[in-house]
């Protein structure tokens, strides 16, 4: 079962992560986001409601 031999797969994995962290990550992080996030503190007003089967009615007692 050759897939249990970690020698070739570990080398591929480690070289891929090495390339990603050293070469690609600074290039990706150098781009500026087009839409900067704003610090809006808008509270979302949600109206709560009850489920029909949780309402207590006097006809079912």
UniProtKB/Swiss-Prot annotation:
InterPro entries: ATP8_metazoa (IPR001421), ATPase_protein_8 (IPR050635). The keyword Ion transport applies. One of its GO terms (cellular component) is mitochondrial membrane. It is a single-pass membrane protein. Its main location: mitochondrion. Keywords: ATP synthesis, CF(0), Hydrogen ion transport, Ion transport, Membrane, Mitochondrion, Transmembrane, Transmembrane helix, Transport. It is found in: Mitochondrion membrane. It comes from the Eukaryota. GO terms for molecular function: proton transmembrane transporter activity. One of its GO terms (biological process) is proton motive force-driven ATP synthesis. The keyword Coiled coil does not apply. The chain crosses the membrane at residues 10-32. Belongs to the ATPase protein 8 family. Subunit 8, of the mitochondrial membrane ATP synthase complex (F(1)F(0) ATP synthase or Complex V) that produces ATP from ADP in the presence of a proton gradient across the membrane which is generated by electron transport complexes of the respiratory chain. ATP synthase complex consist of a soluble F(1) head domain - the catalytic core - and a membrane F(1) domain - the membrane proton channel. These two domains are linked by a central stalk rotating inside the F(1) region and a stationary peripheral stalk. Component of the ATP synthase complex composed at least of ATP5F1A/subunit alpha, ATP5F1B/subunit beta, ATP5MC1/subunit c (homooctomer), MT-ATP6/subunit a, MT-ATP8/subunit 8, ATP5ME/subunit e, ATP5MF/subunit f, ATP5MG/subunit g, ATP5MK/subunit k, ATP5MJ/subunit j, ATP5F1C/subunit gamma, ATP5F1D/subunit delta, ATP5F1E/subunit epsilon, ATP5PF/subunit F6, ATP5PB/subunit b, ATP5PD/subunit d, ATP5PO/subunit OSCP. This is ATP synthase F(0) complex subunit 8.
């Amino acid at each position: 079962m050759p897939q249990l031999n970690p020698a070739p797969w570990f080398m591929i994995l480690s070289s891929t992560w090495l390339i990603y962290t050293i070469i690609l990550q600074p290039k990706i992080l150098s781009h500026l986001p087009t839409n900067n996030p704003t610090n809006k503190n808008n509270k979302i007003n949600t109206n709560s409601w009850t489920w029909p089967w949780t309402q207590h009615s006097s006809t079912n007692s």
